[in-house]
Structure formats: C-alpha cells, structure tokens
Amino acid sequence: MARYMIKRFWAMAATILVITTLTFVLMKVIPGSPFNEERGTNEAVQKNLEAYYHLDDPLIFQYIFYLKSIITFDFGPSIKKPSDSVNDMLERGFPVSFELGMTAIVIAVISGLVLGVIAALRRNGFLDYAAMSLAVLGISIPNFILATLLIQQFAVNLKLFPAATWTSPIHMVLPTAALAVGPMAIIARLTRSSMVEVLTQDYIRTAKAKGLSPFKIIVKHALRNALMPVITVLGTLVASILTGSFVIEKIFAIPGMGKYFVESINQRDYPVIMGTTVFYSVILIIMLFLVDLAYGLLDPRIKLHKKG
C-alpha cells in the first residue's frame, strides 16, 4: 500500500508538471501580450507593465518564475484587476464551484443508479424503454444547450426559478440540473447494462434459491458488483462535471472559478489562467486518485500494492 501511494504521488506530480507546462506553452504561442488591446496605453507604460509581470523576460526565466509561483501557490495579482490577487479569486470562487459541482455529482450518481437499476429490473418493459430514452436524450444534448432551454422554459416562460446569480438554494436548481443530466444519463446506461449482466450470474440464482429477499439480493449482491463499470468512469465524469461548470457558471452568472477562468482567457490574464488551471488540475487528479482507491476497495481482486 505504501509503495502504491508513493508511486501515485510521483505520477500525480508528473501529471501536474505536464499540464502546467502545456498551459505555459499554449499561453506563449499566442502572439501579442495582454496589454495590446488596452486603449490609451502608450508604449512606455506597456513596457513597464510587461516588466512588472515578467512578460519581457526570456521564456526560460518566465517558465522558472511560473514554476516558482506554482510551488509556493502564490500566483500574484491579476493583470486586468491589479487590486485583486489570483489567490483571493480562488478563495472566493472555489466554494461556489465546489458546491455546484458536488451537488451535480451527487444528483447524477443517485439518479443514474436508480434509473439504471429500474431499467434492468424491468428489462424490455415500459420503464426500461422510458429510462433509456431519457438517458439517450440526456447524452445527446450538450449542457450549454440544456442550460439555455431550462432558462427559457422555467425562468422566462414559467417564472418558476431565477435565471441567474447564486444567492439562495433556489438559484442552484437550474445550473445543477444542466450540469447533472449528461453524467446521470451515462451512469444510468452503464448501470442498466451491468445490472442485466450481473442478474444472470449463478450467485444471484443461488441467493434467490436460499430465500433471500429481493431487496437484499439487489442491493447487497447485484448492485455492488454492477458498480464496477460505473466507478471506472466516475473519475472521467467528475472531470467533465467540474470542467463543464466553466460554461454553466458563465451562462448563469455564477461567481465561481469557471467565471474567472473564461474571463481570463478572453482577456489573456495569464496569472488567473495559470492559477485556475493548476488548481483544477490538482482537484481533478485527487478525485481520480480517490476513485481509483474506491475501485480497489470495492473489488477484492485488485491489490493496490501491485498496481503501478
């Protein structure tokens, strides 16, 4: 176990290094600087600003300064909002993004499992076709399109929910739904397929022959083994939810990290881009690691100390 943890730690560190390096390269291959579009800024002032933010240094020194800011987790002030530091933006935005993302994940997992189990137990019946039709529809519609439709129908037409901001629980309904539907549909399809296969296994028939209750057979024996494929893709789904929240936060004017990230790309605010990229990379890698551990704990055939 200790050897596995050490290997995973170095793998996580290497992954973060690759991601941050690619982010740095992509920022630098775009011609120009963040101050090119500033109106009324003369050349001397622009050069002073570039010197202040180390943008006129050789690339190797910029990269070293960039790595130093990552190691110390101090990304300095925003270029477009000098009075606001990147760390303060992360501190304000992360709780909002975390609340939105985790709520969507919980709803997606629970709803997807319920739909998948119902569809498997009523195989080739009305509930099966209805659940899988909803799943196909959920997979087919991108979350930003769904968000627009939800706003139009439930905020503009029916006026049941607010269309934007993030000040009370009722504001969470539409963005959470837009973010959770796609992953929920994927989980439902995987659960249904896996449950159908598990329910035909010999140990399920043995459990029925022993007189165990249907609830115990489904929950204790069938569902636990059917969860393996779901857990396998859960890390990817978590990543898609967290990164998908960028667009959702922008659409619903939610003051989370996604809002800052989208604005920083449009404004070429390098410190904010670096800070949000590194922060999200660390969160996603940790989530993938936890999913990997959960997979090993649920499947006794997997020995963590033998994994590479």
Swiss-Prot record:
GO biological process: protein transport; sporulation resulting in formation of a cellular spore
InterPro entries: BPD_transp_1_N (IPR045621), MetI-like (IPR000515), MetI-like_sf (IPR035906)
Subcellular location: Cell membrane
Keyword Cell membrane annotated: yes
PROSITE patterns per record: ABC_TM1
Domain of life: Bacteria
Record's bilayer topology term: Multi-pass membrane protein
Induction, per UniProt: Nutrient deficiency conditions, which also induce sporulation.
Keyword Manganese carried by entry: no
Location (main, coarse): membrane
TM stretches of this protein: 10-30, 59-79, 100-120, 131-151, 168-188, 228-248, 278-298
GO cellular component: a single term: plasma membrane
GO molecular-function term, one example from the UniProt record: peptidoglycan peptide transmembrane transporter activity
Family matches, as Gene3D superfamilies: MetI-like
Residues annotated as domain ABC transmembrane type-1: 94-295
Key words, A-Z: Cell membrane, Membrane, Peptide transport, Protein transport, Sporulation, Transmembrane, Transmembrane helix, Transport
Function per UniProt: Probably part of the ABC transporter DppBCDE involved in dipeptide transport. Responsible for the translocation of the substrate across the membrane.
Protein family: Belongs to the binding-protein-dependent transport system permease family. OppBC subfamily.
Name this protein carries in UniProt: Dipeptide transport system permease protein DppB
Record lineage: Bacteria, Bacillati, Bacillota, Bacilli, Bacillales
Gene, per the UniProt record: dppB
